[in-house]
Amino acid sequence: LKEEERNVRAAERNEIVTILEACTNCRDQVLILLTSELGFRIGEILGIDYTKDIDYENHEIRVDFRDDNENDARAKNAEERRGRVSDDTFEFLLYYIGEYWDILQKQEYLFINIKGDTIGKPLRVDSVYDMFERMEKKTGIKITPHMLRRYYANTRWEADWPLEMISQALGHKHLDTTIRYLNVLDDKLKTASQEFYRRYSKLYGVEQFLESRR
């Protein structure tokens, strides 16, 4: 993890609600909701192609690695993941698409600039951070996309998701990275970590490697 990300806390539900209420357009609200419910990286969120990456029947959204996105947004790892959003959020997503359809239909990115000289252009990462800075000035609450990602991890942990499932949903290559996302260090996490490493050390025959070198 980057140094600035190591000590980042998870956003709280009441903070997210306050930020959502302070938003002046539904695009920003949908972006925040999807990041909170999917746990995707902001580059992955901005890379969503509404013509290919959204399963409108099953309310699922796919992360697909592409290195040629116009807004330079891309998935971190070259792997596909899927996530499901709540029915209410998906309905709101459809509302957003309908609200800005005149602009959206001219290209394929889900999140675009909705005013100004760059209207209709894919939304960029720096524009998202500018939006969150405006929300901080307006509400006094500091929220970043990474904090929303950690919110996802912590709420799934509290809902008793297996550690490996959370790690997979976040797109982490290493379980240790997921553990650092969780704002807890309790017996439940300790037990889950021990069980994971016990099973995987047996899978790779680590004990045999050590035994052969003694």
PLM segments and residue spans:
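Short, basic (Lys/Arg/His-rich) helix/loop patches that form interaction surfaces
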Residues: 129-168
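C-terminal secondary-structure termini that scaffold catalytic or DNA-interacting sites
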Residues: 197-214
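Flexible interdomain linker/hinge and immediately adjacent N-terminus
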Residues: 1-17, 114-119
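Active-site/catalytic core of tyrosine-dependent DNA strand-transfer enzymes
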Residues: 86-141
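Catalytic-site neighborhood detector that most strongly recognizes the C-terminal catalytic loop/helix
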Residues: 170, 174-195
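Basic, Lys/Arg- and aromatic-enriched nucleic-acid-binding interface segment
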Residues: 13-42
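The alpha-helix within a helix-turn-helix
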Residues: 35, 46, 167, 179
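Conserved tyrosine-mediated DNA breakage-rejoining catalytic core shared by Y-recombinases
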Residues: 47-91
